[in-house]
Amino acid sequence: MKGTNGGIQLQLYQDGYANHDPITVYATQDGTFSAVLFDGPYKLVTKDKNGPWVNNRDTIYVEVKGKTQCEVKVTPYFTISDENITLDNNIVSGTCNIQQIVQDAKISQAMLLVSKTTFVDENTNIARQNLSNINPGVTNISLDI
Protein backbone atom coordinates (compact mmCIF):
# COMPACT_ATOMS: atom_id res chain seq x y z
CA MET A 1 0.00 0.00 0.00
CA LYS A 2 1.31 3.43 -0.79
CA GLY A 3 2.33 4.89 2.53
CA THR A 4 4.09 8.18 1.88
CA ASN A 5 3.26 11.51 0.32
CA GLY A 6 -0.35 11.28 1.46
CA GLY A 7 -1.03 8.16 -0.58
CA ILE A 8 -4.14 7.00 1.27
CA GLN A 9 -6.30 9.65 2.93
CA LEU A 10 -9.47 9.68 4.99
CA GLN A 11 -11.34 12.77 6.15
CA LEU A 12 -12.90 13.44 9.56
CA TYR A 13 -15.69 15.96 10.04
CA GLN A 14 -17.22 17.23 13.27
CA ASP A 15 -20.54 19.02 12.84
CA GLY A 16 -21.74 21.90 14.99
CA TYR A 17 -18.71 24.17 14.73
CA ALA A 18 -17.96 27.17 12.53
CA ASN A 19 -15.03 25.44 10.81
CA HIS A 20 -16.41 22.73 8.52
CA ASP A 21 -13.08 21.86 6.90
CA PRO A 22 -12.12 18.18 7.10
CA ILE A 23 -9.37 16.83 9.31
CA THR A 24 -7.25 14.77 6.93
CA VAL A 25 -5.79 11.53 8.30
CA TYR A 26 -3.27 9.39 6.44
CA ALA A 27 -3.19 5.60 6.45
CA THR A 28 0.16 3.93 7.10
CA GLN A 29 1.65 1.04 5.12
CA ASP A 30 -0.16 -1.48 7.33
CA GLY A 31 -3.51 0.27 6.83
CA THR A 32 -3.76 1.87 10.27
CA PHE A 33 -4.42 5.53 10.90
CA SER A 34 -4.62 7.79 13.93
CA ALA A 35 -5.56 11.32 14.90
CA VAL A 36 -5.63 13.35 18.12
CA LEU A 37 -9.22 14.51 18.57
CA PHE A 38 -11.58 15.92 21.15
CA ASP A 39 -14.30 13.59 22.43
CA GLY A 40 -17.52 13.78 20.44
CA PRO A 41 -19.28 12.61 17.29
CA TYR A 42 -17.36 12.55 14.00
CA LYS A 43 -17.99 11.47 10.44
CA LEU A 44 -15.15 9.53 8.82
CA VAL A 45 -15.42 9.90 5.05
CA THR A 46 -13.51 7.92 2.45
CA LYS A 47 -12.08 9.83 -0.50
CA ASP A 48 -12.99 9.01 -4.07
CA LYS A 49 -10.62 6.60 -5.89
CA ASN A 50 -8.09 6.71 -3.05
CA GLY A 51 -6.73 3.23 -2.46
CA PRO A 52 -5.85 -0.16 -3.90
CA TRP A 53 -9.41 -1.44 -3.46
CA VAL A 54 -12.83 -1.24 -5.07
CA ASN A 55 -13.95 2.39 -5.01
CA ASN A 56 -16.74 2.80 -2.47
CA ARG A 57 -17.49 6.25 -1.09
CA ASP A 58 -18.66 5.77 2.47
CA THR A 59 -19.38 7.72 5.64
CA ILE A 60 -18.74 6.03 8.98
CA TYR A 61 -20.15 7.63 12.12
CA VAL A 62 -17.70 7.43 15.02
CA GLU A 63 -18.25 8.47 18.63
CA VAL A 64 -14.81 9.41 19.97
CA LYS A 65 -14.38 8.94 23.71
CA GLY A 66 -10.78 8.55 24.79
CA LYS A 67 -8.90 5.97 22.75
CA THR A 68 -11.35 4.93 20.04
CA GLN A 69 -10.99 2.39 17.28
CA CYS A 70 -12.96 2.10 14.07
CA GLU A 71 -12.62 -0.12 11.06
CA VAL A 72 -12.97 0.86 7.42
CA LYS A 73 -13.96 -2.22 5.43
CA VAL A 74 -12.69 -2.44 1.85
CA THR A 75 -12.69 -5.00 -0.97
CA PRO A 76 -9.17 -5.39 -2.37
CA TYR A 77 -8.65 -6.10 -6.06
CA PHE A 78 -5.99 -8.69 -5.17
CA THR A 79 -4.48 -10.26 -2.06
CA ILE A 80 -0.94 -11.56 -1.58
CA SER A 81 -0.02 -14.68 0.40
CA ASP A 82 2.87 -17.10 0.85
CA GLU A 83 5.42 -14.28 0.72
CA ASN A 84 9.06 -15.32 0.92
CA ILE A 85 12.13 -13.09 0.62
CA THR A 86 15.68 -14.48 0.51
CA LEU A 87 19.16 -13.01 0.20
CA ASP A 88 21.93 -15.02 -1.44
CA ASN A 89 25.17 -13.03 -1.80
CA ASN A 90 23.88 -9.83 -3.44
CA ILE A 91 20.70 -11.31 -4.94
CA VAL A 92 17.39 -10.54 -3.24
CA SER A 93 14.68 -12.92 -4.42
CA GLY A 94 11.00 -12.73 -3.70
CA THR A 95 8.14 -15.13 -4.24
CA CYS A 96 4.45 -14.66 -3.51
CA ASN A 97 1.05 -15.91 -4.54
CA ILE A 98 -1.32 -13.28 -5.95
CA GLN A 99 -5.02 -14.07 -5.60
CA GLN A 100 -7.50 -12.14 -7.73
CA ILE A 101 -10.55 -10.96 -5.72
CA VAL A 102 -12.28 -8.73 -8.30
CA GLN A 103 -12.77 -10.60 -11.58
CA ASP A 104 -12.15 -7.77 -14.07
CA ALA A 105 -9.25 -6.19 -12.15
CA LYS A 106 -5.84 -5.88 -13.80
CA ILE A 107 -2.48 -5.55 -12.05
CA SER A 108 -1.10 -2.18 -13.12
CA GLN A 109 2.29 -2.45 -11.44
CA ALA A 110 4.39 -4.62 -9.16
CA MET A 111 7.89 -4.14 -7.87
CA LEU A 112 10.48 -5.49 -5.46
CA LEU A 113 11.85 -2.69 -3.28
CA VAL A 114 14.85 -2.76 -0.95
CA SER A 115 15.61 -0.26 1.81
CA LYS A 116 18.08 0.19 4.65
CA THR A 117 15.16 0.73 7.06
CA THR A 118 11.94 -1.12 7.88
CA PHE A 119 10.02 1.55 5.97
CA VAL A 120 10.10 1.04 2.24
CA ASP A 121 7.89 2.23 -0.59
CA GLU A 122 8.27 3.49 -4.14
CA ASN A 123 9.62 6.82 -2.85
CA THR A 124 11.83 5.46 -0.05
CA ASN A 125 14.12 2.70 -1.31
CA ILE A 126 17.71 2.06 -2.33
CA ALA A 127 16.99 -0.47 -5.08
CA ARG A 128 14.00 -1.61 -7.10
CA GLN A 129 13.03 -4.12 -9.74
CA ASN A 130 9.82 -3.55 -11.69
CA LEU A 131 7.67 -6.38 -13.01
CA SER A 132 5.54 -6.17 -16.13
CA ASN A 133 2.78 -8.37 -17.54
CA ILE A 134 1.85 -9.71 -14.10
CA ASN A 135 -0.90 -12.28 -13.73
CA PRO A 136 -2.49 -13.83 -10.64
CA GLY A 137 -0.74 -16.91 -9.28
CA VAL A 138 2.79 -17.57 -8.09
CA THR A 139 5.09 -14.65 -8.91
CA ASN A 140 8.90 -14.62 -8.69
CA ILE A 141 11.21 -11.63 -8.86
CA SER A 142 14.89 -11.04 -8.09
CA LEU A 143 17.18 -8.07 -7.81
CA ASP A 144 20.98 -7.74 -7.75
CA ILE A 145 21.83 -5.22 -5.05
Show where each model-derived region lies.
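A short, amphipathic beta-strand motif
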Residues: 1-2, 31, 94
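Short, ordered, surface-exposed loop/turn motifs in non-cytosolic proteins
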Residues: 2-18, 105-111
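Short strand-edge motifs at loop-to-beta-strand transitions and within beta-strands
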Residues: 31-35, 68-70, 137-143
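Short, acidic Ser/Thr/Gly-rich low-complexity loop/linker segments typical of extracellular
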Residues: 15-30
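Recognizes extended acidic, P/S/T-rich segments that occur
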Residues: 20-22, 113-144
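A short, solvent-exposed beta-strand micro-motif common in secreted/extracellular proteins
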Residues: 31, 37-55
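Structured interaction patches on ligand/partner-binding surfaces of diverse proteins
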Residues: 49-77
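Short edge beta-strand/loop segments characteristic of extracellular beta-sandwich folds
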Residues: 93-101
